[in-house]
Each structure stands twice: as structure tokens, then as C-alpha cells.
Curated annotation (Swiss-Prot):
PANTHER family: ATP SYNTHASE, ATP SYNTHASE SUBUNIT BETA, MITOCHONDRIAL. Produces ATP from ADP in the presence of a proton gradient across the membrane. The catalytic sites are hosted primarily by the beta subunits. SMART domains: AAA. It comes from Leifsonia xyli subsp. xyli (strain CTCB07). This is ATP synthase subunit beta. One of its GO terms (molecular function) is proton-transporting ATP synthase activity, rotational mechanism. PROSITE patterns: ATPASE_ALPHA_BETA. Keywords: ATP synthesis, ATP-binding, Cell membrane, CF(1), Hydrogen ion transport, Ion transport, Membrane, Nucleotide-binding, Translocase, Transport. It catalyses: ATP + H2O + 4 H(+)(in) = ADP + phosphate + 5 H(+)(out). GO terms for cellular component: plasma membrane; proton-transporting ATP synthase complex. It is found in: Cell membrane. Belongs to the ATPase alpha/beta chains family.
Length: 487
């Protein structure tokens, strides 16, 4: 079924039927309905599990029609306690989530239940939208290309983000994807004053808890809606939670006419959940065991993340790369949809340089003088050339040592090392680890600073003065302190 059909179905809810559970296989439940009231694909079903004196209502989503009045549904909660013959009610509509200002400062699950409501607190929900929706039509799309300034030097200079674009943060385990996403949540609220929607897809519950506390401390929680479907949730929840968050973001864009930031951590878990659901539904797997409709599933999500006339959803997606293999179908399928890719390198992280962005492999479609201006493009290209030349010289240095290089190459290596150190930056989220306050560097200052280093104006300053600082004024201050300590 197309999303168009699904949306139409949501707006004209069918008469609800009542069915009986025929079979339960993990999160997959087969349900028999009367012949004249079989629920449509994507319809939300409800049933109640009673264990002892405790009753819990769970939601299921119809995934297949099996024939003989049977439908196959995926449960969004654990199915422990479900029994054959149990009653299941068709809601007559798709899964819906609350939208609007009521979502700010709230934590939701995939079905729109509020997880952080105070005991006895009554929350008025005026409007709910179905999570399966059509992407904006072609004539409503915004063709303007505009830089999204982050205040992080390595990103703004070498892999600039697009307003209303899709940005991927690639990296293996433990290289700083989640920390960088948390940093961006804080910067957007502080510097742009915009609304953020955060989707926690199949990540650690501890990280979600830490994020909420950090946002409360930073005073940005009230401008953010959070939707979580964590690692311990069934695959149906992890597959749908990104759509729930995206629906909330679409309301801010389309109805309130705001620019929105959508954070998804982690888009790989969305693909992984799709693979699990596909296997549970009995589909034949494709390459590396992924679902045969991998590209289609990814497209349905990514096509809805876009700019409409005057308003945008800018999305930042953390993408786990299994075993650091970029040819894996999951990250490879995501690449096709992105406007900018920020690759986080284990090698750079091991040197203690954060954000651990690889300046040579990270890319952006707007790294072009038509979009950025001649100065920005010239400096970015020069910096990349110096870093590339340094990378090529490392083999010679490893065998023969620095002394065997020509004078020109020695200068290149020296400047490259200063640039590498200066690409690191003290971030707000890392303050608890480093004790150093975060910094925001304006784009103009970033361009001028790297231009000066590339031209050799700071060749006299020791490398360590460039480490983990914001602006060049911080470098000069640190250098004066080092000289003072050394007498």
C-alpha cells in the first residue's frame, strides 16, 4: 500500500472490527477477523495483556493480509502474556502521534504516549497526525541552497551543512556520533532558537536519559520534542519511531511555518529493525541478510525530510558503520540521500582530536564557490591540499624520518600538523570530560584563521597551542601562557 492510500485511510477511519488471536510468534501476531471487517495495511490494532492483577494495553500494526480472513501484525510492545483466542480491536486508523506545541519538552514513545508526564498531570492533546504520510509534492519543494552555520570549525569550513538538507554522521562504535548530535541539539537551540525533534532509534537507554538531563541543564529541553524507541524495544517500534518523530517535525514545518531540526540517532538501527521485521514476516533476504525492500523503506523516510517553500526540516542522522565497512548495504543505501557526509575517524579520535571528523573523506555538495563564495572555497581547498600532501608524506617520514624531506615538504608537514590540531575544538557537551567551556566560531573568523595558518603566519607558534581551542585569539593566549611557563 502506498502512503497516499494510507493517509486517505487515516482520514476516513473504517468501522472498527474485533478479531481473535490465532498465533503468536515473538513480536509477530496472526489475527483472525470477520470477513467483512478486515483491517487495512498499517492499521493500528489494540489488545490487552493481563498478567495477575495487572493489565497492559499494547498496539500492533497490520503488516500483511494472509488470506482466509487472517492478518499478520507486528507488535510494538513485548508480547509476553498474549494467548490464542485473545480479543484484538481494530482502531480503524493508522498509528497517530500528538503534534504541535504540546510536544515540546515532552518525551514520547512510538505511539505518542507521554513518558515524562507528572503523576496526575492532565495534558490536552488537540491534534494527532498519522505517522504514514506523503512527502511534499514536487511543486511545493524549495530549490534554494543555503549554508547552515554550526559554529564548529571543521564542519563549517570543510563539510558545510545545507539548510533543509540531510546530513549523515558516519562512524564505527565509540568515535563520537552521539556526542556530536547532542552538541548540535544544544547549538541549534542556543544560536538559532529553532525547534528540534530528536528520534532515539534503537540506541542505549542510558544515552537517552543522559541527553534529557543535559538538555534540562542547558535550558533547551522546552524547545525540543523527543521520541524514543530504544535497544530493548521490539523491532516494530524501532522501525516506526523515526516516522513518529518526523511527523511531529512536519507539523512544525507545514502548519507553524518553522525551520526544524530533526535528529535521528541511529539510522542504522532503523535499517536493522526493518531487516528483523522482514525476516519475521518471512520475506527472502537480499545482500548480507538485509531486507529486499531496503532502498524503498529508506526512501519513504528520507523523501519526507525536505524543504518546502520558505520552511525546512534539516536532518542530522548518526549512521553506525558495521565493522567500519562503508560498502555494507545499510550505510551505502543511506549515502544516496545525503547532502553532506561527516565521517568520524577512529584514527583521529585515537589522537584525542575531537570532533574526530576526517577532513579528507567528509564531503558536502555545497563545497562549491557558487554557494560559498570564492574565499571560503579557496581556503577549504588549500587546507585539504595541505592535509592530503601531509598524508602522502607520512610513508616517507615513517621510513626515513622528517629530516630527509625537502625544506618545502617540511613546511607543509609543519603547517598540516597545526591545521590538524586547530580542527579540534572545545565543545559544550565535552565540558564534563575536559573542564573547558565550549566555543562557537563565526564562519568568517574560521575562514580567516585557516587562511592565516595555511599562509604560514603562525609557523612560529608551537603545535600544542592549537589543540582544543576555538578562535585564533585563544591560540595566541595559550601560546603566551606556554612561553611564560617555559620561561
Amino acid at each position: 500500500m502506498t502512503t497516499a492510500t494510507a493517509e486517505a485511510q487515516a482520514s476516513t477511519a473504517q468501522p472498527a472490527g474485533v478479531g481473535r488471536i490465532a498465533r503468536v510468534t515473538g513480536p509477530v501476531v496472526d489475527i483472525e477477523f470477520p470477513h467483512d471487517s478486515i483491517p487495512g495495511i498499517y492499521n493500528a490494532l489494540k489488545t490487552t495483556i493481563t498478567i495477575g492483577d495487572r493489565s497492559t494495553e499494547i498496539t500492533l500494526e497490520v503488516a500483511q493480509h494472509l488470506g482466509d480472513d487472517l492478518v499478520r501484525a507486528i507488535s510494538l510492545k513485548p508480547t509476553d502474556g498474549l494467548v490464542r483466542g485473545g480479543e484484538v480491536r481494530d482502531t480503524g486508523s493508522l498509528i497517530t502521534v500528538p503534534v504541535g506545541d504540546v510536544t515540546k519538552g515532552k518525551v514520547f514513545d512510538v505511539t505518542g504516549e507521554i513518558l515524562n508526564a507528572e503523576p496526575g498531570e492532565k495534558i490536552e492533546i488537540a491534534e494527532r497526525w498519522p505517522i504514514h504520510r506523503q512527502p511534499p509534492s514536487f511543486d511545493h519543494l524549495e530549490s534554494k541552497t543555503q549554508l547552515f552555520e554550526t559554529g564548529i570549525k571543521v564542519i563549517d569550513l570543510l563539510t558545510p551543512y545545507v539548510q533543509g538538507g540531510k546530513i549523515g554522521l558516519f562512524g564505527g562504535a565509540g568515535v563520537g556520533k552521539t556526542v556530536l548530535i547532542q552538541e548540535m541539539v544544544q547549538r541549534v537551540a542556543q544560536d538559532h532558537g529553532g525547534v528540534s525533534v530528536f528520534a532515539g532509534v534503537g540506541e542505549r537507554t542510558r544515552e537517552g536519559n543522559d541527553l534529557i538531563h543535559e538538555m534540562e541543564e542547558a535550558g533547551v529541553f522546552d524547545k525540543t520534542a523527543l521520541v524514543f524507541g530504544q535497544m530493548d524495544e521490539p523491532p516494530g517500534t524501532r522501525l516506526r519511531v523515526a516516522l513518529s518523530a518526523l511527523t511531529m517535525a512536519e507539523y512544525f514545518r507545514d502548519v507553524q511555518k518553522q525551520d526544524v531540526l530533526l535528529f535521528i540517532d541511529n539510522i542504522f538501527r532503523f535499517t536493522q529493525a526493518g531487516s528483523e521485521v522482514s525476516t519475521l514476516l518471512g520475506r527472502m533476504p537480499s545482500a548480507v541478510g538485509y531486507q529486499p525492500n531496503l532502498a524503498d523503506e529508506m526512501g519513504l523516510l528520507q523523501e519526507r525530510i525536505t524543504s518546502t517553500r520558505g520552511h525546512s526540516i534539516t536532518s542530522l542522522q548518526a549512521i553506525y558503520v558495521p565493522a567500519d565497512d562503508y560498502t555494507d548495504p545499510a550505510p551505502a543505501t543511506t549515502f544516496a540521500h545525503l547532502d553532506a557526509t561527516t565521517e568520524l575517524s577512529r584514527e583521529i579520535a585515537s589522537k584525542g582530536l575531537y570532533p574526530a571528523v576526517d577532513p579528507l573523506t567528509s564531503t558536502s555538495r555545497i563545497l562549491d564557490p557558487r554557494y560559498l563564495g570564492a574565499d571560503h572555497y579557496r581556503v577549504a581547498t588549500t587546507v585539504k591540499q595541505i592535509l592530503q600532501k601531509n598524508k602522502e608524506l607520512q610513508e616517507i617520514i615513517a621510513i626515513l624520518g622528517v629530516d630527509e624531506l625537502s625544506e618545502e615538504d617540511k613546511i607543509t608537514v609543519s603547517r598540516a600538523r597545526r591545521i590538524q590540531q586547530f580542527l579540534s575544538q572545545n565543545t559544550y557537551m565535552a565540558k564534563k570530560f575536559t573542564g573547558v567551556e565550549g566555543s562557537t566560531v563565526p564562519l568568517k573568523e574560521t575562514i580567516e584563521s585557516f587562511d592565516a595558518i595555511a599562509k604560514g603566519e603562525f609557523d612560529h607558534v608551537a603545535e600544542q597551542a592549537f589543540f582544543n581551542v576555538g578562535a585564533l585569539s585563544d591560540v595566541e593566549e595559550k601560546w603566551a601562557q606556554i612561553q611564560k611557563e617555559n620561561g
